[in-house]
């Protein structure tokens, strides 16, 4: 089933969780999350950290348990799988890029044909490396901004 984890994947998540849970109490608090994110170059305010925790903290205790962490990981995985399916639907020739022609055909297939200028603008907006087509990373970045 989409979003489900294998025992090996769950073990990897447990290892990652334990690395962030520096006091070993079985939960991740705002201080631990902040330190882990800071190590990756992301500095979040206390309010941002609390908001991030609240999005995962289903029991409302202000901390993330391993079960809450796993639930969030499964949701993220399912979202990623949906994104990959959407990209493949647009990348009709399977070469890893969406061209203007593929976008035109896909939009027409969805019953939403668009004028050439709008198609060109959509590709230009998403095309970070300016090669005239959109790769998966550019596609994901574009959707994350919406």
Curated annotation (Swiss-Prot):
Residues 8-43, 44-74, 78-113, 114-146 form the EF-hand domain. Keywords: Acetylation, Calcium, Metal-binding, Repeat. GO terms for cellular component: cytoplasm; extracellular region; ficolin-1-rich granule lumen. Ca(2+) 3 binds at residues 91, 93, 95, 97, 102. Ca(2+) 2 binds at residues 57, 59, 61, 63, 68. The modification N-acetylalanine is found at residue 2. The keyword Calcium applies. This is Calmodulin-like protein 5. The gene is CALML5. Particularly abundant in the epidermis where its expression is directly related to keratinocyte differentiation. Very low expression in lung. One of its GO terms (biological process) is signal transduction. Ca(2+) 1 binds at residues 21, 23, 25, 27, 32. Binds calcium. May be involved in terminal differentiation of keratinocytes. Changing residue 58 to G: Confirmed at protein level. InterPro entries: CALM/Myosin/TropC-like, EF-hand-dom_pair, EF_Hand_1_Ca_BS, EF_hand_dom. Pfam families: EF-hand_7. One of its GO terms (molecular function) is enzyme regulator activity. Associates with transglutaminase 3. SUPFAM superfamilies: EF-hand. Changing residue 74 to R: Confirmed at protein level.
